[in-house]
Amino acid sequence: MAIQAAEISQILKDQIKSFGQDAQVAEVGRVLSVGDGIARVYGLDNVQAGEMVEFPGGIQGMALNLEADNVGVVIFGSDRDIKEGDTVKRTNSIVDVPAGNELLGRVVDGLGNPLDGKGPINASERRVADSKAPGIIPRKSVHEPMATGLKAIDAMIPVGRGQRELIIGDRQTGKTAVALDTILNQKSYNDAAGDDENKKLYCIYVAVGQKRSTVAQLVKKLEETGAIEYSIVVAATASDPAPMQFLAPYAATAMAEFFRDNGRHALIVYDDLSKQAVSYRQMSLLLRRPPGREAYPGDVFYLHSRLLERSSKLNEDNGGGSLTALPVIETQGGDVSAFIPTNVISITDGQIFLETELFFQGIRPAVNTGLSVSRVGSSAQTKAMSSVAGPVKLSLAQYREMAAFAQFGSDLDASTQRLLARGARLTELMKQPQYSPLTNAEIVTMIFAGTNGFLDEIKVSDVGRFEEGLLNHMRSNKKDVLDWITNEDPKIKGDAADKLKAAIEEFAADFA
């Protein structure tokens, strides 16, 4: 069979034409050394600070130290499968995470990967984890209340939408309980808002360095109460690598900023930032960065300030959205003057102080109302609340002062005895069981009863019973009064005070 030369040349031409030129160019480097979750990589000359890089087997890392001859990369995952000589690829993207409504009701890790077994998350967008905080011009003063449902906080240390309020205390003082109650309290408000996105508050809870069992318990509680529908849980637990614990708060803030930037409202709880600082210290020391006070690196203040500055209230031109932050800090032996606590106190707009002593006395939430402060929240209080809350702060401050002196002498004049009696009852009134947040109107009613002498003749041990009875009476017989406080937000004085007084008197007359 004769082979035609023309045919051969035609076949070759066709082959050349159909040759696929899908060559992929990737900038790669080699691992020089690896250990303790840190890899030293040679050859990634153009890598950016904070860029995501990829190791064999899909393990990801983040370039943090850009040095003259190598790059220090922190590894998001186990470093056991990475060895010297492995190739490392650039991804050309700064670390980003998924964001959007699709994340609501889900539990994810610090990179936005699902942990709850409910399938993949097809998020509408991705956001850079460590983005820049809004400037001065787009912001607005905090003026809308963010109700926690806790009497002691809503009355005396009010938090507004867009505020950063620190929750600080020793271990086992109920810090997470305060934050969790705040998330649960939003359910009634979100249900009442219906489709009005402007009134809803979405919640993001970040667990940093906690036990998995604790996080599982919290998620279970959110599911039982139905609060998971408007919440996102970001978990970087104690068994996760330090880089994941460092990244989780930034990633969660990026998810929360989706709501803020779309004219909606979000609340983010960082539980807790002490553990984030510890994991950042670990990474920095392993990267051979010079240590400073308490062996923390020099930029540990910036670590928290750039995170918390992203929580803000935006003005109407920028959508009017807000992001409220409740960072949690754990102190050692009540030492508030340690490095991290002082840093975060100076960054935030106030702090809620929880004390071990109060906790063991049975005063829960164990809020020290003398040391706790809200620097911007008073302008966000409802009119009804601010008109009844003033006398409480004063009465409790005087009570604390007098109680110290009263221990020394027994012959006290009548006015001092009255002050001590009322202070003891108000302190009792501020107690509240966990998972039972109250509405704004219910708190106003209870505090009004306390400051207007309705508790003065009742035994301290009966205050809880009186409160329970009064709340049931108001909910079943005087719902119109509660609705009036909620909808009209009147200043409780003059006729308004008389109306509320009459409703309480109706119950107090029959209480025994």
UniProtKB/Swiss-Prot annotation:
GO cellular component: plasma membrane; proton-transporting ATP synthase complex
Molecular-function GO term, any one: ATP binding
Site residues (Required for activity), renumbered to this chain: S372
Keywords, sorted A to Z: ATP synthesis, ATP-binding, Cell inner membrane, Cell membrane, CF(1), Hydrogen ion transport, Ion transport, Membrane, Nucleotide-binding, Translocase, Transport
Membrane topology: Peripheral membrane protein
Protein's cellular compartments: Cell inner membrane
Disulfide bridges in this chain: none
Domain of life according to the entry: Bacteria
Binding site for ATP: G169, D170, R171, Q172, T173, G174, K175, T176
EC supergroup of this enzyme: translocase
Transmembrane segments: none
Keyword Transport annotated: yes
Known catalytic reactions: ATP + H2O + 4 H(+)(in) = ADP + phosphate + 5 H(+)(out)
NCBIfam families: atpA, PRK13343.1
Family: Belongs to the ATPase alpha/beta chains family.
Its biological purpose: Produces ATP from ADP in the presence of a proton gradient across the membrane. The alpha chain is a regulatory subunit.
Complexes and interactors: F-type ATPases have 2 components, CF(1) - the catalytic core - and CF(0) - the membrane proton channel. CF(1) has five subunits: alpha(3), beta(3), gamma(1), delta(1), epsilon(1). CF(0) has four main subunits: a(1), b(1), b'(1) and c(9-12).
UniProt name for this protein: ATP synthase subunit alpha
Organism (species): Jannaschia sp. (strain CCS1)
